């Protein structure tokens, strides 16, 4: 509730003693201190008072003095807006059992501004509690030192677990990969095109592939590019493999013919004697 709304009642009702407070509920159970407004203590307004105080700014004659009201409003008007809601909240929580039959509290009077200092002193405590809840690991106040120690003790196991977690993948990799020594390597066994030390893998042809290549070599010892592509697709081989096979087959054919010619020459020379 704004301070403008609270102080507006002071101007409308200057003579507070002429207005009597209403007492609701059972007269036997109700508290007697709510009936007389002139004998009430100023510190009870924020905690147990359910009526409205209309005795502020009165002189001895019972008339309202405008200068006193203006001075009291200017000095304490900054603390009114901040403490109105907290005072109303404390009033409802503290008087639940004693004044259950009483009506809802009215707006705070003008004189409660001077008695709002106990409430304003509790506001920093609420702020400290709020800071400790939002940032439990911060050192904003002395009451959070134990919380800081707890946070430090909780964070240290997490930091200790990080190196252990980071070291586990290396151990797993070491266990899954067996150690290979140089003498265990077999250079001549490789399925890649370019093996270690630049040695190419040996291609193993099936019986069907060898038979088809021999038929093609019987008709044509040299292949064109178009025919090489057709054979490669038919036998599921690469053009390079087809070319190398034909090169090796021609070398073998030349070697065989050379041996035949040498045998024929040696045999004919031995028979013929001039």
From Swiss-Prot:
Superkingdom of origin: Eukaryota
Key word 4Fe-4S present: no
InterPro entries: Antp_homeobox (IPR050296), HD (IPR001356), HD_metazoa (IPR020479), Homeobox_antennapedia (IPR017995), Homeobox_Antennapedia_CS (IPR001827), Homeobox_CS (IPR017970), Homeodomain-like_sf (IPR009057)
Keywords of this entry: Developmental protein, DNA-binding, Homeobox, Nucleus, Transcription, Transcription regulation
Record feature DNA-binding region, as residue ranges: 198-257
Chain span(s) of sequence motif Antp-type hexapeptide: 180-185
Listed Low complexity bias regions: 92-101
Region Disordered, residue ranges: 68-177
GO biological-process terms attached to the record: anterior/posterior pattern specification
Subcellular location field: Nucleus
Polar residues biased stretches: 75-91, 116-143, 168-177
Example GO molecular function: DNA-binding transcription factor activity, RNA polymerase II-specific
One GO CC term on file: nucleus
Transmembrane segments: none
Biological role stated in the UniProt entry: Sequence-specific transcription factor which is part of a developmental regulatory system that provides cells with specific positional identities on the anterior-posterior axis.
Similarity section: Belongs to the Antp homeobox family.
The protein's name: Homeobox protein Hox-A5a
Lineage, uppermost ranks: Eukaryota, Metazoa, Chordata, Craniata, Vertebrata
């Amino acid at each position: 509730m704004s301070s403008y709304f609270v102080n507006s009642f002071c101007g409308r009702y200057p003579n507070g003693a002429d207005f009597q407070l209403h007492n609701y509920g059972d007269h036997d159970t109700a508290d007697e201190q709510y009936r007389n407004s002139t004998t009430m203590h100023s510190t009870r307004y924020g905690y147990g008072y359910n009526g409205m105080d209309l005795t502020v700014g009165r002189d001895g004659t019972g008339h309202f003095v405008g200068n006193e009201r203006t001075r009291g409003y200017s000095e304490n008007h900054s603390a009114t807006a901040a403490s109105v809601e907290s005072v109303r909240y404390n009033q409802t929580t503290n008087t639940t059992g004693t004044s259950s039959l009483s009506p809802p509290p009215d707006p705070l009077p003008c004189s409660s501004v001077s008695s709002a200092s106990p409430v304003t002193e509790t506001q920093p405590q609420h702020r400290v509690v709020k800071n400790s809840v939002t940032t439990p690991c911060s050192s904003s106040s002395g009451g959070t030192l134990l919380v800081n120690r707890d946070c430090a003790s909780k964070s240290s196991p997490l930091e200790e677990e990080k190196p252990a977690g980071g070291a586990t993948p290396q151990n797993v990799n070491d266990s899954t990969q067996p150690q290979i020594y140089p003498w265990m390597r077999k250079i001549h066994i490789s399925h890649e095109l370019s093996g270690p030390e630049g040695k190419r893998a040996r291609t193993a042809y099936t019986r069907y592939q060898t038979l088809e290549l021999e038929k093609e070599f019987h008709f044509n010892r040299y292949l064109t590019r178009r025919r090489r592509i057709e054979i490669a697709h038919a036998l599921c081989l690469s053009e390079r493999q087809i070319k190398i096979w034909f090169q090796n087959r021609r070398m073998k054919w030349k070697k065989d013919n050379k041996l035949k010619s040498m045998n024929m020459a040696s045999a004919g020379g031995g028979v013929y004697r001039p």
